[in-house]
Amino acid sequence: MAVAIAAARVWRLNRGLSQAALLLLRQPGARGLARSHPPRQQQQFSSLDDKPQFPGASAEFIDKLEFIQPNVISGIPIYRVMDRQGQIINPSEDPHLPKEKVLKLYKSMTLLNTMDRILYESQRQGRISFYMTNYGEEGTHVGSAAALDNTDLVFGQYREAGVLMYRDYPLELFMAQCYGNISDLGKGRQMPVHYGCKERHFVTISSPLATQIPQAVGAAYAAKRANANRVVICYFGEGAASEGDAHAGFNFAATLECPIIFFCRNNGYAISTPTSEQYRGDGIAARGPGYGIMSIRVDGNDVFAVYNATKEARRRAVAENQPFLIEAMTYRIGHHSTSDDSSAYRSVDEVNYWDKQDHPISRLRHYLLSQGWWDEEQEKAWRKQSRRKVMEAFEQAERKPKPNPNLLFSDVYQEMPAQLRKQQESLARHLQTYGEHYPLDHFDK
C-alpha cells in the first residue's frame, strides 16, 4: 500500500503539471514550484504524529523500503490543436488568428523551405562552405516567433532561422551571412547559418552546444531586475539538453525566478544519436518539475499548438517572473548538416513518412484551404515568387566581395592595443610579399 501511495504521488507530480496542458498554464493564480517559500516553522509533534521537517523537500514519511520505478510514471501528454489534416480538434483551443497572420505563418515557413533548398544545393556546388537545413521543423520556429513580442530576446542554437524569417530579417542578410561577404553583419567571422541581429533582438549563434542556455538565463535575470516587461526565449535540441550547461541553466532560472522560456526542439536525432540512446526518462519536459519549472509537451508540427503554448508561457513568465519549459515534438527531415549523411543511421521510409504524412507546412496548408484563404493557383504563384526572391538575394550575395582582411582586428577593443596593431602590420607585410598566393581580388580593398 505504501508503495502504491508513493508511486501515485510521483505520478501526480508529473501529470499535474501537464495533464491539462494549456488549461493548467492558464490558471491565473497558479505558480510553479520555482517560487521561493518562507522558512518552515518548526513544530513539536508526538511520535505518533511525526512529520518531516527537512527544508529541502515536501514529502511524507513511509515505513517500507521501496525505490520509485521510472516506468510507474505515465508519459507527459502531447498538446495539439490541429490534426494532420489541418482540422481544429477542440474549438476552445483555436487561437482564432486573423487571415493575415496565418498567411504570414505559412509564407514564412515556405520561404524558409525554399531558401534551405537553394543554399543546400549551393553548398553541394562548392559556393558556400557549410549549411544546415530546417526541413520538418519550420512549425517550431514560426509558431513560437509569432507568439513573442518583437522586443523579446532570442537565444538560438543553429536551427532557428525561421524565427528571424518571421521577424522580417531580409533574405539579403541571410545570404550575406552564409557567403561571409561585405554585407554580413558579422563581417565574415562566423560559420554559415550562425546568424545574429541586434535590431531584431536575436543574439548571435554560437557553435558549442548549450552554451546559450545559462547565458539566456542571465539575460532573463537582468530583464527581471530592470522590470523590462520582456521575456527571453532560449532554443535548443534534445541532444543539447544532455549538456551540463542545460542543467545549470534550468536550476539557475528556477531558483532566481527568471522570465524565460526554454524551448526544446525534440527532433528525434542529435546528429546521429537517436532519442533511445540520448535519454531513458520521459523526454525533456519531464525534467522540468524536478527543477521547479512549469512544463508542457506540444506537437511541434502543429503551428497553432506551438503558438498557443508559447503565447501563454510568455504571458505568465512576464507577469509572474518564472521560467517555463516547452518540449516541441517534431522530426528532422533533412540531414544534420551538409557534413552529415543521415542514410547511415535511419531509413528512407522513416524520413518519407514524416515528409509526406506529417509535415508542418502541409498541415497548415490544409487548414488554409479549408478556410478558403488559399488555393492551388495562389500556391503556384507564391512558390514561383518565393524562389525568385531567394534567387535574387543569392545572386546579389555571390557578386559581393569578402570583407577587408583588416577587419580581423577590429570590434574587440574600443582602441586597438599595441600588440594587436603589431599583428595587423605583420599581416599587411605578409600579404604584400606573398599576395599572389591568396585570392585577394575576392576581398574588399
Swiss-Prot record:
PTM remark: Phosphorylated at Ser-337 by BCKDK and dephosphorylated by protein phosphatase PPM1K.
PTM annotation (N6-acetyllysine): residues: 356
Residue stretches in coiled coil: none
Phosphoserine PTM positions: 337, 339, 347
Modified residues (N6-succinyllysine): 356, 380
Region (Disordered): 33-52
One GO cellular component, as annotated: mitochondrion
Keyword match Mitochondrion: yes
Keyword vocabulary terms for this entry: Acetylation, Disease variant, Maple syrup urine disease, Metal-binding, Mitochondrion, Oxidoreductase, Phosphoprotein, Potassium, Thiamine pyrophosphate, Transit peptide
Pfam families xrefs: E1_dh (PF00676)
GO BP, sorted A to Z: branched-chain amino acid catabolic process
Organism domain of life: Eukaryota
Outcome when changing residue 413 to C: In MSUD1A; uncertain significance; decreased solubility; changed mitochondrial alpha-ketoglutarate dehydrogenase complex assembly; loss of 3-methyl-2-oxobutanoate dehydrogenase activity
Annotated catalysed reactions: N(6)-[(R)-lipoyl]-L-lysyl-[protein] + 3-methyl-2-oxobutanoate + H(+) = N(6)-[(R)-S(8)-2-methylpropanoyldihydrolipoyl]-L-lysyl-[protein] + CO2
Result after altering residue 265 to W: In MSUD1A; uncertain significance; no effect on solubility; no effect on mitochondrial alpha-ketoglutarate dehydrogenase complex assembly; loss of 3-methyl-2-oxobutanoate dehydrogenase activity
Binding-site residues for Mg(2+), renumbered to this chain: 238, 267, 269
Substitution effect: residue 190 to K: In MSUD1A; decreased 3-methyl-2-oxobutanoate dehydrogenase activity
Associated disease: Maple syrup urine disease 1A: A form of maple syrup urine disease, an autosomal recessive metabolic disorder due to an enzyme defect in the catabolic pathway of the branched-chain amino acids leucine, isoleucine, and valine. Accumulation of these 3 amino acids and their corresponding keto acids leads to encephalopathy and progressive neurodegeneration. Clinical features include mental and physical retardation, feeding problems, and a maple syrup odor to the urine. The keto acids of the branched-chain amino acids are present in the urine.
Function according to Swiss-Prot or TrEMBL: Together with BCKDHB forms the heterotetrameric E1 subunit of the mitochondrial branched-chain alpha-ketoacid dehydrogenase (BCKD) complex. The BCKD complex catalyzes the multi-step oxidative decarboxylation of alpha-ketoacids derived from the branched-chain amino-acids valine, leucine and isoleucine producing CO2 and acyl-CoA which is subsequently utilized to produce energy. The E1 subunit catalyzes the first step with the decarboxylation of the alpha-ketoacid forming an enzyme-product intermediate.
Name this protein carries in UniProt: 2-oxoisovalerate dehydrogenase subunit alpha, mitochondrial
